[in-house]
Amino acid sequence: MFCEQCEQTASGNGCHQWGACGKSPEVNAVQDLLVYCLRGLAPVVLKAKELGISTHQADVFTGEALFATMTNVNFDKKRFTKYIRDCITIREQLKAAINQPVAWTDICCYQPNFNESLVEQGQNVALTLISQATNNLDIFSLKLTVLYGIKGCASYNFHAQELGQEDEKVYSFIQEALASLDRNDLSLNDWVNLALKVGETNLKAMELLDAGHTSTYGHPTPTSVPLNPRLGKALLVSGHDIKQLAAILQQTANTGLTIYTHGELLPAHGYPILKQKYPHLYGHYGTAWQNQTKDFAKFPGAIIVTTNCLMPPHETYDEKLFTIGPVGYQGINYLASDETGTPDFTPAIEKALSMPGFTTEETPRNVMVGFAHDAVLKVADTVIEAVQQGKIRHFFLVGGCDGAKPGRTYYTEFVEKVPKDCIVLTLACGKFRFFDKQLGSIGTLPRLMDVGQCNDAYSAIKIALGLANAFNIEVNQLPLSMILSWYEQKAIAVLLTLLYLGIKDIRLGPTLPAFITPNLFKLLSETYNLQSITTPEKDLAACLA
């Protein structure tokens, strides 16, 4: 196997025996085969679009299928086999609809054999892709960057589409990018531009998702969220999917269950319509994804995982674990969606009601969420005045993905060392390194503001652009430093968005992507001053200099 799409890839060079995420070589092979088939579907979709034939089914399918291949989403070989079958079926249906002679390339005509050799077929197409690296390693690096960025973009677009927010330009570019992966006539500069186009498209996908969330559930408002459980039966919802969380809340109304969020669903508590409509959405349980084996084992109720990050489940809790959407693990309960895209959560609800729930109370603890762009920009005048009066010296955006590497303690130490006249904005699961720190406030402004989920990088961008406009300066002139952590492909998409916007001086860690060559990193460093983190002390001093 060959996989280097996540930050924890083995020895920083790539997983070759078994995935650091827990993915087997067999699952990796069928994932590679699915991506290969999607690359063959893409030119057919683009031709159909050119002729005015509807490609909506293919576009939505492509998004979910790419999402399923992301790190810590789906480990179920049978589910990937079905995705591959569906991909070929959709491709051939579109060819029939095109109904004219087309000189399709070999990849558009590929027919997998659905037998015991499926894994070997996946391994073969992976080797074919890897062999391209010998031609130009830097271009191969950019191809992988585009692929991984498109996976992240597709995941955000998947959630936006669930909420009724769609843009044909996003769908079209995802297909164009996939089709480009089979081209060998593009220059290094062409691939750089394509990677930046991924960033541009991802910005639009995040904008669509923000519109879907805020038009459906209201703009987030600063909200206190309990970290201590309350007495009673309980159900835990993990992942990112706020639409599915809302469906769970609707189906559990008047059951007596208390609903807790886990991981990246913490920001859901900031959406006013959810809180007003569903009072049994109570608190948050656990911390970041890599601690789930401990958190899930202790939780005295059923658990539903809506998106990444899923780790290989332990036998102590596998019977109370349920997955939906693109998420899966062989042998774990899967709740399929109906034609409206919503699962019947009855099995999970019944499991939760059969379990003891919380029987003892704990000391109350709370954290604040809800500092998205609408809430922050409403107090822009207060922020500007505080900066002008010297009360606020600097802003730090410290966020991104969390992970299990010891080096990630850097982010905790960094936030702890930030001077008291500075404000920390945070987002995504990287916040769990410090989300419960009591940093105090500057006047009426809390020094630690949770902007939201990883897709709420869009909110952080809007805040930065809004403040730059208010100060009548460029974003790169703001007293703002970005200290980012990455783990999976959504983070790659967000990084490409920031580079597309021309944002400079980003510090990235805990390690650099294995798929980025030294030459490519040098190019990014020279163009954007992208740099790796060093120590909290050195980086703080440099940012404040």
Swiss-Prot record:
Hybrid [4Fe-2O-2S] cluster binds at H240, E264, C309, C401, C429, C454, E488, K490. Its EC number is 1.7.99.1. Its cofactor is [4Fe-4S] cluster; hybrid [4Fe-2O-2S] cluster. GO terms for molecular function: 4 iron, 4 sulfur cluster binding; hydroxylamine reductase activity; metal ion binding; peroxidase activity. Keywords: 4Fe-4S, Cytoplasm, Iron, Iron-sulfur, Metal-binding, Oxidoreductase. It is an enzyme of class 1 (oxidoreductase). HAMAP family: Hydroxylam_reduct. Belongs to the HCP family. This is Hydroxylamine reductase. It comes from Rippkaea orientalis (strain PCC 8801 / RF-1).
